[in-house]
From Swiss-Prot:
Ni(2+) binds at residues 78, 89, 91, 97. Gene3D superfamilies: ACT-like. Chain A, domain 2, Met repressor-like. Belongs to the transcriptional regulatory CopG/NikR family. Its cofactor is Ni(2+). Transcriptional regulator. Keywords: DNA-binding, Metal-binding, Nickel, Transcription, Transcription regulation. CDD domains: RHH_NikR_HicB-like (cd22231). It comes from Chlorobium phaeobacteroides (strain DSM 266 / SMG 266 / 2430). This is Putative nickel-responsive regulator.
Length: 134
């Protein structure tokens, strides 16, 4: 584990009160935990916008009865085989499936995969969750 550094932060009263409410609503034990998470989120966002390496999950639901949808989903996934590291498929009911695709790679590639899958007719919902790969 790395060394822990302490530093002071000056905030106006209304901002610290809002931050404390945020901490309480998220069940953090202290301000340091919440601040660490906010910094990490911002660093991941920076990697995303600058095209760094990210890891995450594409989560989508779709109607597998839509004509040619499954074939198109598979074609796109094969086009991104360097980005996709695993996938899991779940049958929600007779008509609908849930697919979770684990990804790792350049942020732009991950975004392109997500956008291509989301644009297909029959994909009901798609969300992308990213984190730092480092």
């Amino acid at each position: 584990m790395s060394e822990i550094y302490r530093f002071g932060v000056s905030l106006d009263k209304s901002l610290i009160e809002a931050f404390d409410r945020h901490i309480q609503s998220r069940h953090y034990h202290n301000r340091s935990e919440a601040l660490r998470d906010l910094i990490r989120e911002e660093l991941v966002r920076k990697k995303w916008t600058e095209g760094g390496t990210v890891a995450g999950a594409v989560i989508m639901t779709y109607d597998h009865h839509k004509r040619e949808l499954v074939n198109r989903l598979l074609d796109i996934q094969h086009d991104f085989q360097k980005t996709i590291i695993a996938s899991s498929h779940v049958h929600l009911d007779h008509d609908h499936c849930l697919e979770v695709i684990a990804v790792k790679g350049n942020a732009a590639d991950v975004e392109q995969l997500s956008l291509k899958l989301k644009s297909l007719v029959g994909v009901k919902h798609l969300s992308l969750s990213i984190s730092s790969a480092e």
